[in-house]
A protein has these predicted regions:
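Charged helix-capping and loop-helix junction motifs
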Residues: 119, 247-251, 278-281
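Catalytic grooves of carbohydrate-active enzymes
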Residues: 259-298
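Acidic-and-aromatic substrate-binding clefts and catalytic sites of carbohydrate-active enzymes
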Residues: 107, 115-116, 139-148, 211-218, ...
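Structural recognition of the beta-strand scaffold that forms the well-ordered cores
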Residues: 97-101, 135-139, 161-164, 208-212, ...
Length: 303
């Protein structure tokens, strides 16, 4: 197995994406962004994708809460017990697609929020509800602490499920677009701290899925999270919504990339992804016109 870092952007886009990913999360930018990261460690991804488990048994106490509607499906560990990686449904005949949204906020952005910067996007959540689009929100623990009422509202709405995007939005391997890096023990604790923040906010619909900040990971990162009993979730469609100014371009990029079983990465952060809500209003009706049904990640993993 290789221990090389999988990045979220093609090499040509790295310089442009650095600033976006440092403050926003994986998947922004060029149409090919994310291709290398999504591959993960080949053996871990390939093996885990062929074996699923219908239980999150063994998850730590701070992990997905009792009271969620049902136990969400998880993937079996990869070789040597590595955390499994999911990026697209194995069942690719059904025209299903999962829109996922990273609710990003780093551990040091509190002062910026206090000064009026908006890391939330209530209009986006409202639009998803109005359009009746089941969605998975990959939330940082720091975001849940900053916006506890919104975290609770999202996390008690059956239209949504909340997945873990770390507490701090620090990198789980280095280099990763300038993000501060956590070592193995700190990385594992960071995941638990995020689940605890969701619970503190009153979110119930939490699921044992994890998205690496910046989308960057390697074997060591997968090993560090193995005891958390989570499934790492990447994507196969990059929206390019981070710091985008043209919602039409974002929508076209998504529409061009979606295939049956796709996972689309977008963002739920006004300051870093200001046109996402408008793009969603274009994406949803067009995909429905093409015969697609929107589902949460848990449904894709369960197929």
């Amino acid at each position: 197995m290789t221990n090389s870092v999988r990045k979220v952007a093609a090499a040509a886009a790295t310089a442009v994406l650095g600033a976006a990913l440092a403050g926003c999360g994986g998947g922004a930018g060029a149409p090919d962004a994310g291709r290398e990261a999504r591959m993960g460690t080949p053996a871990a991804s390939a093996s885990a994708s062929t074996s699923t488990s219908a239980s999150a048994a063994g998850a730590p106490a701070a992990s997905p809460q009792a009271g969620a509607p049902a136990k969400p499906p998880t993937m079996a560990p990869g070789p040597n017990g590595l955390t499994p990686v999911f990026e697209r449904a194995k069942q690719r005949t059904d025209k299903t697609v999962a829109l996922t949204f990273d609710a990003d906020m780093t551990s040091d952005q509190g002062p910026r929020a206090a000064d009026g910067e908006h890391f939330d996007n209530p209009a986006l959540i409202s639009t998803l509800r109005t359009l009746k689009v089941p969605s998975t929100i990959f939330m940082t623990g720091r975001w849940a602490e900053e916006y506890p009422d919104q975290a609770k509202s999202i996390g008690t709405d059956p239209n949504f499920e909340i997945a873990n995007h770390s507490y701090s939005h620090h990198a789980f391997t280095s280099p990763c677009y300038g993000l501060p890096a956590l070592d193995g023990a700190a990385a594992r604790a960071d995941v638990d701290r995020a689940f605890a923040a969701f619970k503190q906010a009153g979110a119930v619909n939490t699921v044992p899925y994890f998205r690496f900040p910046g989308g960057c990971y390697d074997d060591q990162a997968l090993r560090a999270l193995s005891t958390a009993k989570v499934t790492a979730v990447q994507w196969d469609v990059v929206s390019g919504d981070a710091f985008a100014k043209d919602p039409v371009a974002v929508a076209e990029q998504v529409l061009d990339g979606v295939k049956p079983g796709s996972v689309v990465v977008m963002h739920c952060t006004r300051s870093a992804a200001p046109v996402t809500e408008e793009a969603v209003r274009r994406i949803v009706p067009e995909l429905r016109k093409r015969g697609y049904r929107f589902v949460k990640v848990s449904e894709l993993i369960g197929k």
